[in-house]
C-alpha cells in the first residue's frame, strides 16, 4: 500500500520517467554516434533538454526564478561542469566503448556525487550512504563479471568516468 501511495506523489512518476529516459539515453546515444559527431550529439542532447524545459515553463506559466548574484559563479560552474564537460566526455567515451560497459560505468556518478559532498562540502556521511556506494560498485562489478560488458579501451572508460565526476561536481554545486 505504501508503494501505491508513493507513486501518487507528484515527484515520484517524474523521477521514474527521468530514470527511464536516462537509462535509454546511453544505448540511443551510442546508436546515434554512428552518424553524428560526439560534439554535435552532446550539444543536441542538452539543447533538447533546454527547449523541453522552456516549453514546460511556458505552458505551466511558472514564475520566473531569480538567482542571487552570490550564486552566479556556482551556477556557471554547474553549467560548465554538467552541461558542457560531462556530455562531451560521455560522447567521446561512447565512441570507443560498448553501451553495456558505459551504462555500468555511469553508476559511478552517484558515488562521485556522495564522495564530493562528503570531502569537499563537508556533508553528513553515515553508514547507509557508505553501504549504498558499496552496493553500487559491487553491483557494477557483479554485472560485468561474466565478461558481458567490455572495457577494452582504457581512455574511453576514463572519459566516461570523467563525465561521471563532472556530473558529481554539478550535483554538488
Predicted regions and their residues:
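Cytoplasmic-side transmembrane-helix entry/capping segments in multi-pass membrane proteins
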Residues: 11-16, 68-78, 125-137, 156-157
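Specific alpha-helical transmembrane segments that line the substrate/conduction pathway
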Residues: 40-51, 90-124, 163
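Residue-level recognition of pore/gate-forming positions within transmembrane alpha-helices
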Residues: 19, 46-50, 110-111, 133-136, ...
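Hydrophobic transmembrane alpha-helices of multi-pass small-molecule transport proteins
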Residues: 53, 116, 125-146, 164-167
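Specific transmembrane alpha-helical segments of multi-pass solute transporters/efflux pumps
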Residues: 21-26, 54, 60-100, 105-106, ...
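C-terminal ends of transmembrane helices
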Residues: 53-64, 112-125, 169-173
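Glycine-/small-residue-enriched transmembrane alpha-helix faces in small-molecule transporters
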Residues: 1-45, 49, 149-173
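Helix-coil boundary and interhelical linker segments in multi-pass alpha-helical membrane proteins
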Residues: 35, 92-98, 145-152
